Curated annotation (Swiss-Prot):
This is Cathepsin D. It comes from Mus musculus (Mouse). It comes from the Eukaryota. Consists of a light chain and a heavy chain. Interacts with ADAM30; this leads to activation of CTSD. Interacts with GRN; stabilizes CTSD; increases its proteolytic activity. GO terms for cellular component: collagen-containing extracellular matrix; cytosol; endosome lumen; endosome membrane; extracellular space; lysosomal membrane; lysosome; melanosome. GO terms for molecular function: aspartic-type endopeptidase activity; aspartic-type peptidase activity; endopeptidase activity; hydrolase activity; peptidase activity. Disulfide bonds join 91-160, 110-117, 284-288, 327-364. CDD domains: Cathepsin_D2. Residues 21-64 form a propeptide.
Length: 410
């Protein structure tokens, strides 16, 4: 018969053998759009130069459908975290983006005229003992040019842990990623992040590269194949939030999680029943498709419908696609209701109006933006951080579903 002490030891060993949740602190930064506006720059030329896509309109060999989503989202990305690539880890700040599926960072071999490369961390394969050459070229087309480079293989550490912090991390071995040697235009010069870590489905991965989270699942590095986001919407609040790999944390939400099935395994796409602006306006009549995208800070919809929405809340065009509302009117604006899975998700005006500094003054911007995504991928609504900040969000690959619960205010 085992003694109580031995039993406790066995239970302790069993408990330690299970995987804890991996926590990646997120920091909030000023978006590219706001940075360029502050210095008097313009992104309108970029926006007007044709289809501005996160990824090229190329097809996976498994499908004849082109897959695309818009780079315009990255102009408004606001949250990033740290990862490491190589052994020992070389640290990079990346946007954890559920609207794409590839990992890329700048390369030490970037072109001499690539200004964005100068001001960001660069991966150096010579400094990694786990680097394996791949060399396949990759090309991600944008409206003003293309982000290009070649693929490499190495170990990805999440989080980076080069600071010897005590936070538990994981190492994803043999991960294929992009070394970017050329970045387009001036857009990424203003970016506070080095690269992108896509967390969408493999279907939209350029060059059919296995996404980091899929590789992590294959290597059985987490107990549950889910990840979740808490975003701190306090403009002054740090940390900016937390990404959890392998689980959820109830301290970040109250009530129960409500789930929606993914309708297409490319982006994290779900069905939206409708969107209402107070009692004045109903959009997405008869239902529409929406993607849950951590890579954009805004709530985006078809141009004509969003024009109606902006009018209903009294927003007027400012510059660079932004709409402004007099700050003194914010408290009297209507509540916006997104109906998902038969349940209403409320966005009160203090949640969808963004207070930002411009020219030393505080102005109030609409958190909605119009953008048309053509068939076959579109039309789509994009539920960005304006929505995710109010609702703790769970991305469940085991059951191909997305969960929402009311986020707490820390």
């Amino acid at each position: 018969m085992k003694t109580p002490g031995v039993l406790l030891l066995i239970l302790g060993l069993l408990a330690s053998s299970s995987f804890a949740i991996i926590r990646i602190p997120l920091r909030k930064f000023t978006s590219i759009r706001r940075t360029m506006t502050e210095v008097g720059g313009s992104v309108e030329d970029l926006i007007l130069k044709g289809p501005i896509t996160k990824y090229s309109m190329q097809s996976s060999p498994k499908t004849t459908e082109p897959v695309s989503e818009l780079l315009k989202n990255y102009l408004d990305a606001q949250y990033y975290g740290d990862i490491g690539i190589g052994t020992p880890p070389q640290c990079f700040t990346v946007v954890f983006d559920t609207g794409s599926s590839n990992l890329w960072v700048p390369s030490i071999h970037c072109k001499i005229l690539d200004i964005a490369c100068w001001v960001h961390h660069k991966y150096n394969s010579d400094k990694s003992s786990t680097y394996v050459k791949n060399g396949t070229s990759f090309d991600i087309h944008y409206g003003s040019g293309s982000l290009s480079g070649y693929l490499s293989q190495d170990t990805v550490s999440v989080p980076c842990k080069s600071d010897q912090s005590k936070a538990r991390g994981i190492k994803v071995e043999k991960q294929i990623f992009g070394e970017a040697t050329k970045q387009p235009g001036i857009v990424f010069v203003a970016a506070k992040f080095d690269g992108i870590l896509g967390m969408g489905y493999p279907h939209i991965s350029v060059n059919n590269v296995l996404p980091v989270f899929d590789n992590l699942m294959q290597q059985k590095l987490v107990d549950k194949n889910i990840f979740s986001f808490y975003l701190n919407r306090d403009p002054e609040g740090q940390p900016g939030g937390e990404l959890m790999l392998g689980g959820t944390d109830s301290k970040y939400y109250h009530g129960e999680l409500s789930y929606l099935n993914v309708t297409r395994k490319a982006y994290w796409q779900v069905h939206m029943d409708q969107l209402e602006v107070g009692n004045e306006l109903t959009l997405c009549k008869g239902g529409c498709e929406a993607i849950v995208d951590t890579g954009t800070s805004l709530l985006v919809g078809p141009v004509e419908e969003v024009k109606e929405l902006q009018k209903a809340i009294g927003a007027v065009p400012l510059i660079q696609g932004e709409y402004m509302i007099p700050c003194e009117k914010v408290s009297s604006l209507p509540t916006v209701y997104l109906k998902l899975g038969g349940k209403n998700y409320e966005l009160h005006p203090d949640k969808y109006i963004l207070k930002v500094s411009q020219g030393g003054k505080t102005i109030c911007l609409s958190g909605f933006m119009g953008m048309d995504i053509p068939p076959p991928s579109g039309p789509l609504w994009i539920l960005g951080d304006v929505f995710i900040g109010s609702y703790y969000t769970v991305f469940d690959r085991d059951n191909n579903r997305v969960g929402f619960a009311n986020a707490v205010v820390l």
